[in-house]
């Protein structure tokens, strides 16, 4: 998956507008530019699906991630470790929060959440869907990996949906190592988090 489109696209457009402002300010006080507007534009060019070109570009930037799940002797998750490449972290604290939020969201997807539908309509109330409560969330170690990124947006790739992608596989593999049972559907069955189906 890609990083945050807004961080990359809007960030580069903003950087370009700021470069124009900086150029206009050369040797002048800011008050001389009162009322002047500066614009920046950035279009991230990608190739269409099925393009007959060598090495087609489907995303402008990619983020990479790895996650680890630690299951205790009682079968409950003790800790999640999530390392995510963000290029340059514009706001490291926000990146950590995004990682933690994605992990919690995907933990629910992997272990407890069930959204039953009948004829495309929900058959359960929101409060019964199995969302994790704050006191049920294990320790989450969020690792923001900064590495040189693109030459746009000051190297920021951003972070988005990728925070929730590796979580369920990490949890499934942790349970496989725990009890030797391969689980291939979500929510995972036969864990301390499993709910009795009605």
Model-identified regions with their sequence ranges:
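C-terminal catalytic domains of large/alpha subunits in multi-subunit enzymes
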Residues: 1-198
